[in-house]
């Protein structure tokens, strides 16, 4: 049993019980020429830096495909997009500006795949079950699983996008099986190779994967630590990975615990407080994990652990291995 200190400030201390299989979706993407896509997809796929929001949406998708994650793709310029651009520029030997300047745009667009594609919804995509997720931990413990609350949330995680963006891209769509919708082209991105080490940078609020030559080849925005539970700086190691974890909840172990709560087992699922994967660190009670709130990554605080979007945490988990160095630095 592994104890952790890494949940959102509204939640409390949990202890990890690992299950073995990740949550998965059936996928069937149909890529089409831009001429066959709705006008918004055409505009985004042909966007130039001067095209403002269309260019930012295209850039976010290309950054995600290049493994410099902007977290939740929403088409809006913000701190996570700037971090992703900074990381991409550094990795590619470009001047670090945090902006979509011409050299950065040209480097991103070496990936010639369309940013937005048409996708045919499958029965598995909309099968659910979908149900509201209670905020109270004791109420969560009464559920069999902490799955998605809506088909839009499920599709948002599948395509690394905010549900609001999917709605904007697909006005009038009912999100029913057999329906074609426009989505970010992220499923076909290459898997990450194994890393030589992992670096967590507090000042940049990022987690990076570094190869044997010392080059950062993937970067993810993160939520980490707080005044009450600071990030445990130092040199640690990866202990292992647990996918689709369930938890034993112990309210006695957190400063913001609800005194009326009791110990309880919190079921697995994407809306579990640590999401769909836990990467265990040699520092007791600490790890890198997913989140039920991808829109808040890089914008809030944690109980000391390192929180990523579920899709970034899953991607990272496939590139690490037991014994790998994990450097947590200021």
Question: Where are the predicted features?
Answer:
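Bacterial N-terminal signal peptides that target proteins for export
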Residues: 2-14
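Bacterial N-terminal signal peptides
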Residues: 13-23
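Compositionally biased, proline/threonine/alanine/serine-rich low-complexity intrinsically disordered stretches
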Residues: 27-59, 90, 113, 117
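A short amphipathic alpha-helical interaction element
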Residues: 49-97
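Short alpha-helical segments in extracytoplasmic peptidoglycan/chitin-binding modules
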Residues: 60-63, 72-74, 84-89, 151-159, ...
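Extracellular LysM carbohydrate-binding repeats and other cell-envelope/extracellular binding modules
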Residues: 79-83, 87-125, 167-197
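Gly/Pro-biased beta-strand-loop elements
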Residues: 187, 193-291, 318, 322
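N-terminal targeting pre-sequences for secretion and organelle import
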Residues: 311-330
């Amino acid at each position: 049993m592994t104890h952790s200190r890494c949940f959102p400030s509204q939640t409390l201390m949990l202890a990890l019980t690992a299950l073995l299989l990740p949550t998965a979706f059936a996928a069937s993407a149909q890529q089409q020429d831009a001429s066959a896509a709705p006008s918004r997809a055409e505009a985004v796929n042909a966007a130039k830096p001067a095209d403002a929001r269309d260019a930012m949406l295209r850039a976010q998708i290309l950054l995600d495909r290049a493994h410099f994650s902007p977290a939740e793709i929403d088409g809006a310029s913000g701190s996570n997009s700037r971090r992703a651009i900074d990381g991409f520029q550094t990795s590619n030997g470009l001047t670090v500006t945090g902006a979509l300047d011409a050299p950065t745009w040209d480097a991103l667009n070496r990936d010639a795949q369309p940013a937005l594609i048409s996708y045919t919804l499958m029965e598995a995509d909309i099968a659910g079950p979908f149900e509201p997720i209670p905020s109270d931990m004791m109420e969560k413990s009464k559920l069999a699983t902490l799955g998605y609350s809506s088909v839009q949330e499920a599709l948002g995680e599948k395509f690394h996008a905010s549900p609001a963006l999917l709605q904007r891209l697909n006005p009038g769509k009912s999100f029913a099986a057999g329906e074609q919708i426009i989505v970010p082209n992220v499923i076909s991105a290459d898997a990450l190779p194994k890393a030589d080490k992992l670096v967590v940078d507090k000042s940049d609020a990022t987690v990076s994967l570094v190869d044997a030559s010392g080059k950062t080849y993937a970067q993810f925005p993160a939520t980490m630590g707080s005044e009450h539970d600071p990030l445990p700086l130092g040199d640690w190691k990866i202990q292992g990975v647990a996918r689709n974890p369930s938890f034993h909840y112990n309210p006695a172990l957190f400063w913001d615990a609800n005194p009326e709560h009791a110990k309880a087992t919190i079921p697995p699922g994407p809306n579990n407080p640590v999401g769909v994967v836990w990467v265990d660190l040699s520092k007791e009670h600490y790890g890198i994990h997913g989140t039920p709130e991808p829109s808040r990554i890089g914008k809030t605080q944690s109980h000391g652990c390192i929180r990523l979007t579920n899709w970034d945490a899953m991607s990272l988990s496939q590139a690490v291995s037991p014994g790998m160095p994990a450097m947590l630095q200021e």
